[in-house]
């Protein structure tokens, strides 16, 4: 894995690379990082899943980025399709996190406006890693009650999830960095609410055609957010890009 920008460097360790980057948390919410993989023509899935676009380089960056945050967030649809389970990091990664003053493992947060999640699913299979479910006050009380035994609940918003309010609660709990892994609807809400501080995207050397989903889907924000190119890494024709909010 070689860096082309800002400084050309060869044979980089992605774990060391991302750990050296600065991510200052705002006072009222975590620093929000989105990580996605897409084809050259912008598709984020092949036959409904992102795995068809992944590669050795993308997987290495995916695992490196997962070692950084205090909380990993995904939408309920992504959690179901990708069959999310408890976060796993090796002993060295956990030790590095503890040395930085973090918990050994990041929390996992799932956004579901109606709390329609199966408490018996793999997501909730480890009682030592209780996910956070971010939902609304209008969610079914029966659905919420079923989840209380296996998850911590954050209520934010009534009809739709208020991400800014949810992030304020996470920040109050001491979480300074949040990694969002999609899907595109959740990404779009982050953009509409101007909550994206960093966008990392792997460009797979593939053309898919068709009408596959894009990294962000939905009504566009009123004002487009400009980000600065912060890093370009390449491996085997795969580009790994990092854009960050202007400091």
Predicted regions and their residues:
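Enzymes that bind and transform nitrogen-containing heteroaromatic metabolites
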Residues: 1-247
């Amino acid at each position: 894995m070689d860096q082309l920008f800002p400084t050309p460097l060869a044979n980089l360790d992605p774990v060391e690379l991302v750990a050296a980057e600065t991510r200052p948390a705002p006072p009222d919410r975590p620093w929000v990082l989105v990580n996605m993989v897409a084809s050259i023509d912008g598709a984020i899935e092949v036959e409904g899943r992102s795995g068809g676009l992944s590669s050795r380089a993308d997987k290495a960056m995916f695992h490196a980025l997962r070692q950084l945050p205090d909380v990993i967030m995904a939408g309920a649809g992504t959690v179901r399709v990708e069959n999310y389970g408890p976060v796993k990091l090796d002993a060295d990664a956990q030790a590095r996190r503890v040395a930085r003053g973090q918990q050994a493992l990041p929390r996992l947060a799932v956004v579901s406006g109606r709390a329609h999640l199966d408490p018996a699913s793999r997501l909730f299979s480890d009682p030592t890693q209780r996910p956070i479910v971010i939902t609304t006050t209008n969610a079914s009380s029966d659905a919420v009650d079923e989840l209380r035994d296996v998850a911590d609940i954050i209520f934010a918003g009534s009809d739709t999830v208020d991400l800014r309010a949810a992030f304020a609660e996470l920040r109050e709990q001491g979480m300074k960095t949040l990694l969002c892994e999609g899907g595109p609807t959740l990404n779009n809400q982050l953009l509409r609410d101007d909550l994206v501080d960093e966008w990392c995207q792997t460009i797979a050397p593939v053309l898919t055609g068709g009408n596959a989903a894009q990294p962000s889907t939905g009504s566009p924000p009123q004002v487009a957010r400009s980000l600065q190119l912060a890093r370009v890494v390449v491996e085997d024709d795969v580009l790994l890009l990092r854009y960050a909010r202007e400091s």
